[in-house]
Each structure stands twice: as C-alpha cells, then as structure tokens.
C-alpha cells in the first residue's frame, strides 16, 4: 500500500532529520512557518498565539501515553469536529493509524537519547489517488501555555495535535479545517471510499427491513477494518452545538467505535437464546455530553445483559463521551451516517477482494465541441455528451459495483478565494457489448449518483453482465476541474477512457475503405422457439463484416429476453447484418434459426419482429420462433 509514498512539496523527511541532527538544531518548517499565515487565511487573528514546542508545554512530552485510544482526543477552538471524529475512529484501528503515523517508535521521544531529537515529524495521508508524506516541525499554537486546537486528555501526549498540524499544512492553514467533512478525512486516513447515508430521507427509523440491511452492512464494514461516523444535521447556525434533551449535540460528528449484536439474558440460557440487540457505540469528540436515553451508561437496561457481556463490551459508568445506543435509536435521533470502506484488494485475504480501476480526468473547455469536456449534467442535452466518458465491463451474471468520483481538494486554495467544491455527479449507461467509441445519444440509464458540491460522490449499485459507460459531470456546463474516478468490481473491469468519437482514419483507410454507415442492433428477445422438454437454453449472435456480439445464455425458456446490443461501423452496405439464435447444449450447440437485416438508414421501421429462417436453404423456409430486433442506422458516424 505504501510502496510509493510521495514526499509532499518534495520535503524528504529522512534527509531533513539527518541534516538537523548533523547541525544539532531543531527543525523549522519553511513551508508551514510558526506565523499567523499558518493559522488563518482571512479575518482578524484572535488572542495572541505563541508557537511552542512540546518541551516548552510540558516536562516529559510523548507521542503516545499508554498507547493510542479514541478517548485521547478533544476538539479545540477551530470548528473541525469532523476531523477530530475521524481521528477518534482512526485511533480504534491499529492497522490504520500505524500507516498514518509511520515508524512511530522511531518518531517517539527517547529520554535516553535527548540529542537525537530533531523537532521533526512526518505523517501519511491519501491525497487524490496517491499517498503523500507530510513533514512538519513540532511547533504548536498555544494561548496561556494551552494547545488551542486538537489536544489529548494527557497534557504530555501530542500525537493528535501533530497529526492535525500535518493535515492543516495540507489544507493551507488551520482555519481551512473549519467546517469540513468527516467523509473526506476518513478517506484521507485510509485510501478507502466513503458512502454517506441520509437516515431521514431513507426512513430507516420506521423501515425495519432497510434498517436491518444497513446494520448488517455497517457490521461488515466495521469487522473488516472500516471507519464509521454519525451526525445530526444542524439546519441553521443557531442549531450548531445545540444540545437535545436526549444529550446528543447537533452539528457534531460522532465516531462509531464499535458495532455489535449484544446477547440479552444471563447464564447458560442467554448463550442459547437467539435474542440479540443491534447496538452501536459512539464517541463525542468533545469528550463529554453523552446520550442519556435507553442503554446510556447508568440506565437500567444494562441489567438485561450479563456482567461478562458488559465487560466484553467495555461498558463504563463515566462521562467520558463514549456511550452505547440501539441501532433503532441511532436511526431515530441521528440524520446522517458515513461508512468508509477500506477496500480489500489483496488476493491473499479470506474476505471479499475487489479489483480497482483508478483513472485521472478533467473537465476542460474548448471551442470545438469534439474537444470540449465541460458539458454539464443531463439537463443540458446539447452538451452533455461532450463530457469525459469511461467504459467498463461487468463480467459476472450480476456484480456489485462501487464507483467514486473525487474532485481535486480545494481547501489549500481558500486563501485565493477558490476553495469551494464544484457540484459534481455521474450517470451510468448500459451500452452495446462491442462499443469502442464515445456515446452521442441516450441509451438505457443503469444508475445515477446524486449531484452535490462535496469533494467526493459515491455510488454502490448491482448491475447485470454487460458493458457500461460512466459520464462524470459538473452540474452546470462551463466549469473546469480535475477529478479522480475509482471503479471497484469483483473481477477486472477493463475500465478505460473513451477518447475517440468514431473510427480513426489511417493509412489503410484508402485501401480497405472507411465506414459509411453506423448501425445499432438491439435484440430484445425471441418467442415460440423450438420445443424441448426443459425449454431452450438459447443465446443470440449478431454478425456484421467479421465483427460479432454474443448474448448470455437464457436458460429454460422458449420466450427468452436477451436485451443485447451491438454497434457496427459498416463499409459494405450491401452486406446484411445476421442475427442467429442458438440452443446451448453440452456437446454441441444447436442452430435454431437466423434473420438477415439490411438496416438501411432510410428504413423508418425501427422495431422488427421477424420469423427465424434456415441458413442453408435456398428457398426461405420459416423455422419455429420469432426474434424482436430494434435497429438504428445513420450515415453520421456520431449519431449513436
């Protein structure tokens, strides 16, 4: 995962530390100096801030005190509850925080070797498709000798303050962290993909089936090393930090630190009883203000759970900001959940593995419509197909597909007034099985994302076997920006960008000819096929000038629905297109019949129901069955 970590701004941690040790000085980062520029990008500075090294704040500074825990963190003055919640989630995953905080034992203060300390640290974050190594010095902003931003329970523990400083450096300054998105931080810590879920819109509080499905997915994400966050939407500024009667706080991002089914009852009977309760453990980054409803720390509901089960769950009676809730109550009181999947691409794992395709792209503007790549969403039909297009394949009868589009992070450009995200999204279309060139007309929409001005947009969808085109867009045309497209499938999807609008002219075109006609053939299905005891296991093959497209086998039916399409760029207009129907057998497939399609561009009857014919008979003789075919032809190769 970290075989190729890129030094951020070309600062090499090892070389810088070596140089400081040689010169016996503490590192001072010239790219993130101890000045107001590193604190704010606008507005008037508050109280006089003094930058201090940990040794100037306490006697015995440490990266970690008694290990790392989600209890370590407390939010400071900046409105980065979202980042602190993500850190709380990170702290509960040793395999993840050790990647964000690399070689932590070497970075830790060593009281026995005080001269080895160089005042320099480094941290890894996933940034727009690659891992970056961010170097910082250890000077931290304080007021009255107190850290003003993220800090630990222990006065001499500094891991969270240093991680926050490195993240602020990526963002441009501390103020740029104000009002961010937990989903972004979770992705930056893991390289995974975040899926936001609107609990209110999905009506999870009242729909038990949907709620149970969501809990199972959260259980799977948590058990496989993912990170989860929950929050209550603050609709107005007055709502921010508003505490509800139940003890929860609006506008706060709560870290989910455990997901489990809790066994109710006592003794041996409880072990064999099937009654279990879906429960979630959460933590408030403020470190206090807990839930006071059912299953809160001191509630009588805990009497239903055995002492051993409570100990296993780590139930404590203290106002430490961590508490349990039933998942039903979570769905009733919270409005949003963010699941960050840590995508498993290792083939050595016992869990499901994914194949990832990762492509960089951009929305760009050009006077030539063929070169313009900033067409806006489908509302703008005249320019929509000018957007970037990416083709991928689903190679199983049905597969779960995860798609994420991320625009280049904008926080570091806030100082120049360019820090706002574009509203982005994407549509997915099922296309012909042999498409190699860009789409120019609408086809069946297989799925679509929401459009939102967040850094990332995610979609999970189940799709049948076939070929698909993703069209990522900005909501309005005329906007420019870079993006990263990530597509996860069970088997390799051969995802790639479609760059050409039509077959290219080559040196062979004058000798072999160039296409004069484009024809799209859509075989919908067949009816009345030759009887067999179990029904036909049929498939179709569409042939044209040496190119062919084959459908999947439709088992046990004489009225199959093939729903297969092919696109053909034709040079020999007098040569018909052939559609053959076959019956799949163990030893040898059986020919059931065929039809020939002239597919002239002036044929206005686009939908045809044709009788199957024998292929060898000179006289046209009908065989059992008909095939339904939709045909579209044009002399403009950019018509389809």
From Swiss-Prot:
Entry keyword annotation includes Membrane: no
Pfam families for this protein: C2, Calpain_III, Peptidase_C2
Top-level taxon of origin: Eukaryota
Residues the record marks as active site: 81, 252, 284
All residue ranges annotated as the Calpain catalytic domain in the record: 26-343
Class in the EC hierarchy, top level: hydrolase
Disease linkage: Vitreoretinopathy, neovascular inflammatory: An autoimmune condition of the eye that sequentially mimics uveitis, retinitis pigmentosa, and proliferative diabetic retinopathy as it progresses to complete blindness. Patients present during the second or third decade of life with posterior uveitis and reduction of the electroretinogram b-wave. They become more symptomatic when cataracts, cystoid macular edema, and disk edema diminish visual acuity during the second stage.
Name the UniProt record assigns to this protein: Calpain-5
Gene name tied to this protein: CAPN5
